């Protein structure tokens, strides 16, 4: 992949960009083998990749410059702004949105936040696109609610220019720190969730719910989990750290009892909406801490699927799973190092199957799916 920003030394986010995709995949596979050394693996499945460029469904843009000439991108190490509108990871459909937003910011009087001076209102623009229908969600991250009236007044012009904007919000982030978003979300449209669909499974994206940024590879990840679960005798399943329910919704059958647990209420609202659309009445999603939920249960499911953040599931949950001893565990991880540490805390399980998913091309990161079977 060619990138003018990388060639000019202005952006180093894609640190592996000079390597071919095959070289990157080989290096990631070697890293995974190294991390799982000493843990016998019955089957290494072929790694799964995706597009080399234009694959991201989300842009996170720092807004800098002036209200008349805003700049979208990031701040360089030396503090100077870098325009990322031409980033080759973004789909072509993002360009007209960025183009329309620049005059809109002037119309709405949204002064870009100046980090050095601690002045201004508009900190970030967060844009997400659905692969299902091309609909988009736009979030204005503001320092305060001061400009909300002006923002609302100017919105009809923006929506006329960009009818693909289905969900628009203002997120209030008052803290002078490099924090992407605050707790307060103010909806500026009637529609509050973006419709997505992977493998004929309806999914929903809300402003403060996590969603994978590489939909092509994510859909293959979910489909693989569904295939694996379909080969197992599973009637009762837990989906821990379930997010918007991608794994559970793919794996569930009308006969299966499934409980999905996620600490973010916004994500659980998405999962419940999807389950209702599918007519799956034995699926139950709850906004709880996954470890606290699991350790409070007296029953043992046939399978526990975990998809934790980078820190992994941790020793307390590992210890409880080892004691509870479900017949199967499926571990989906964006950090194979912590996954390997967790698996070593599950001595009564063998690794039946491992598959790498290249969710983050041009970086050292990847997703991995692992099936563990009780000895």
UniProtKB/Swiss-Prot annotation:
The active site is at residue 334. Keywords: 4Fe-4S, Iron, Iron-sulfur, Metal-binding, Methyltransferase, rRNA processing, S-adenosyl-L-methionine, Transferase. S-adenosyl-L-methionine binds at residues 212, 241, 262, 307. Gene3D superfamilies: 2.40.50.1070, Vaccinia Virus protein VP39 (3.40.50.150). InterPro entries: 23SrRNA_MeTrfase_RlmC, MeTrfase_TrmA_AS, MeTrfase_TrmA_CS, SAM-dependent_MTases_sf, U5_MeTrfase_fam. One of its GO terms (molecular function) is iron ion binding. Its EC number is 2.1.1.189. [4Fe-4S] cluster binds at residues 3, 11, 14, 87. The keyword rRNA processing applies. PROSITE patterns: SAM_MT_RNA_M5U, TRMA_1, TRMA_2. It catalyses: uridine(747) in 23S rRNA + S-adenosyl-L-methionine = 5-methyluridine(747) in 23S rRNA + S-adenosyl-L-homocysteine + H(+). GO terms for biological process: rRNA base methylation. Belongs to the class I-like SAM-binding methyltransferase superfamily. RNA M5U methyltransferase family. RlmC subfamily. Catalyzes the formation of 5-methyl-uridine at position 747 (m5U747) in 23S rRNA. This is 23S rRNA (uracil(747)-C(5))-methyltransferase RlmC. It comes from Salmonella agona (strain SL483). The gene is rlmC.
